[in-house]
Amino acid sequence: MGGKVYAMDGLKIELKTNICLVEKCLRLVSYSNHSLYWNDPTEDCVWNCLARISRFHYPTLSLVSKGFRSLIASPELEATRSFIGETENHLCVCLNLNKNNNYNPRWFTLSPIAKQKLKSIPWHRHQYPKSSTVVANGSDIYIVGGFVCGTSSKRVFVFDSRSHQWRRLHDMRLPRVSAVVNIVDKKIYVIGGYKPRNIKDCGEVYDPNTQTWEPLLPTTVNLTIQNCVVSGGLVMGGKRYTTNGTKMNTCFVELENLLLGLSETYRDLVWRELKEDVWRVVRGLEQLSHNQNFTYVGNSGGGRRVAIWWKSMVVFRPRGRSHSTKKCKTEIWCAEISVERRGLGELWGRFSFSFRDSFIYIFLWEFF
């Protein structure tokens, strides 16, 4: 605060705001029944103060008190951030930190500041059930269906990546596992994941205005939504694309008039025109090893930028142990890449920061 660095719950947090305003904020939120109003200039300063704190630190601040958790989740805070130009884009990732083959999914956010470690998102009991489907819409991340306690589930949870709050939607009509989910015109379309007994069981749609699920009949839905379940096809943003036989993983991103994905065939970042079926390798990324286990590609804050995630296994000998003792740790890496056209049929990528200095190294887990 004011150029100083303070430690909170073991984490060092550097705040850009004046220490007096933060202390006043702490005093205000100490009253559990206290509410803040925009018409009080002093309390406007409090909102202004909190809005200048990076969202990356919200999980730590939420531990201060219930009052702080309420403030961080409030729409007034987001409105203030937008008004003063302190909006941020964060990457969210779910990692299975399994040990001894025990399923252990955890959500994390990654700070836009280079070389920052992942910060854990508040734990939720059903934050990523096995075989559930995840889809994002704006700042909301939807977790649909999956197995809960070994049984297929009707549940749908929503994680607000801005406030770090979880909420639950009304249950689906039927339990679904590994369903296809797409959001079109703010409605959630869910298809498959259930062996239908009749035509009404094929899919359903959630209307946020009425907060109800309705059957999705093939005769009442447009062809774009139906094509979600066509083998070898892909639907993003209400449009359908084909993979044209290229073996891809499940990660694609639409970038302006381009479609980018991670190819298991070439072990590279590949691209294609939206109106074409030919996949090409993005050039200029020779620093990326073809032996890397790429896991995800996603949009990185707008423009022609993508973020690529991958993991690697490192074997090492702990200090003080015998030479025969070895451990294996998983490293999760992330790089931000900007792409640009150079000539006809060529797309070049470059790292938005130094390959050596700004790659993000995160030590997550040790496997014995």
Curated annotation (Swiss-Prot):
Pfam families: F-box, Kelch_FKB95. Keywords: Kelch repeat, Repeat. Kelch repeats lie at residues 140-186, 187-233. Residues 35-84 form the F-box domain. Disulfide bonds: none annotated. This is Putative F-box/kelch-repeat protein At5g02995. It comes from Arabidopsis thaliana (Mouse-ear cress).
